[in-house]
Amino acid sequence: MKKIMLVFITLILVSLPIAQQTEAKDASAFNKENLISSIAPPASPPASPKTPIEKKHADEIDKYIQGLDYNKNNVLVYHGDAVTNVPPRKGYKDGNEYIVVEKKKKSINQNNADIQVVNAISSLTYPGALVKANSELVENQPDVLPVKRDSLTLSIDLPGMTNQDNKIVVKNATKSNVNNAVNTLVERWNEKYAQAYPNVSAKIDYDDEMAYSESQLIAKFGTAFKAVNNSLNVNFGAISEGKMQEEVISFKQIYYNVNVNEPTRPSRFFGKAVTKEQLQALGVNAENPPAYISSVAYGRQVYLKLSTNSHSTKVKAAFDAAVSGKSVSGDVELTNIIKNSSFKAVIYGGSAKDEVQIIDGNLGDLRDILKKGATFNRETPGVPIAYTTNFLKDNELAVIKNNSEYIETTSKAYTDGKINIDHSGGYVAQFNISWDEINYDPEGNEIVQHKNWSENNKSKLAHFTSSIYLPGNARNINVYAKECTGLAWEWWRTVIDDRNLPLVKNRNISIWGTTLYPKYSNSVDNPIE
């Protein structure tokens, strides 16, 4: 389904009336397995000569970091909630509907190589930053090592840049120097190449998840979701009660990636005066191994919350159609869900005026939000939206393993119905109409109560009409009618005997004819699915 969604979204973006540059496909190529960049990292700048003492310090740093004993698969792990008790099934009356709420235990396991960036921590995120690979990195609060730095090489993947124009050497890799270098690369492209590539299509990354718990969504989208949800305000309470269905979508439009050279040895990322003892004093050890931000994606990040109070099982399909722009004109149920749903968007980047935007609207307006920022230019500047980290020990990718258990809540609405009786026959008739009403005890077990119409077995002369109103939890409906023939050997004759009928909005039972030739019909208006 996600692949289909990605195709639909791509079609939306390429349908914009913009000139397509010659090499747009190179700029918009996207490798799903490696969000940040698929290009090779730049080569390291030449090492400057070291004094014997500096070489000794460098060798000691290399030996210490390369000797750290840790399992890279267990360093960065997020453990979410553990579910021990699953609440029982329950039902309740809500207006003209009976709602049945069911809960199931579910789990999610997600490996994330990319870490999402939100505005609160963007100042900590820059290519080449040295960080500790520990729980703070998992929590998206990277602990940057405050040490002197050596030079490093940055490269950018904007199209057309030749003759090493896409690379720059930062001699002293501080945060400000690196950010200035990134700005220099972007401005270089704007001045020399932007005219030849007027509309660089953003690379798209799309992911979605129906919402049930905050822990589940953190495992799905990373701990940055905590900050995002301060604005999205996912209504977990209403979701848990079965009164609302909500979906969260992460939609990235990546304009360019900035990559960092892989160091040939760990000490190449440190200034000449840095010692092993300084790193140890800063807490660098096997529990907090050093890592570096190897690549940063710049662009526009949109988080969406889609909301509806529908109990339909087609809500996910309706949301997918709204996001992709797929027509649902032939499906009344999907059309009604979209019409009666809303969205909230939190947007980072893509605007020269506001870095963060919060927008509320109807699903019909959603495509306009996704179309904006589809291309990179001076008017749609990119901000850091995601980054990857590598272990300094061996340049291996540092992957965050997220897992959580959660309760999936589903609800189904059963609409009230009625039986309309019409007796126009030339005889005395008696009816017997019964049904079962289903409820649930505190443990979630079904409680079945048998119900009978108050006019059962009472003689009715033509013309007689009546309506029997049935609640949404009515099941196993039985309709029986007999007529008096006046014959001594067959005083009563069955006219209709229909059993175990489903609940419908309007069931019309008609009987007519004579004592010897009675007739009946059982028809349905607007059946309830």
From Swiss-Prot:
Cholesterol binding, short sequence motif: residues: 515-516
One Pfam family matching this protein: Thiol_cytolysin
Residue spans crossing the bilayer: 214-227, 234-243, 312-321, 329-341
Domain of life: Bacteria
Topology class, membrane: Multi-pass membrane protein
InterPro entries reported in the protein's UniProt record: Thiol_cytolys_C (IPR035390), Thiol_cytolys_C_sf (IPR038700), Thiol_cytolysin (IPR001869), Thiol_cytolysin_ab_sf (IPR036363), Thiol_cytolysin_sf (IPR036359)
Short motif Conserved undecapeptide, span: 483-493
Regulation acting on activity, per entry: Activity of listeriolysin O is regulated on multiple levels. It should be high in the phagosome, thereby allowing escape of the bacteria from the phagosomal compartment. Then, once inside the host cytosol, the activity must be controlled to prevent lysis of the host plasma membrane and loss of the intracellular environment.
Keyword DNA-binding: no
GO MF assignments: cholesterol binding; toxin activity
PROSITE patterns: THIOL_CYTOLYSINS (PS00481)
GO cellular component: extracellular region; host cell plasma membrane; membrane
Family affiliation: Belongs to the cholesterol-dependent cytolysin family.
Subunit structure: Homooligomeric pore complex of 35 to 50 subunits; when inserted in the host membrane.
Name this protein carries in UniProt: Listeriolysin O
Species in which this protein is naturally found: Listeria monocytogenes serotype 4b (strain F2365)
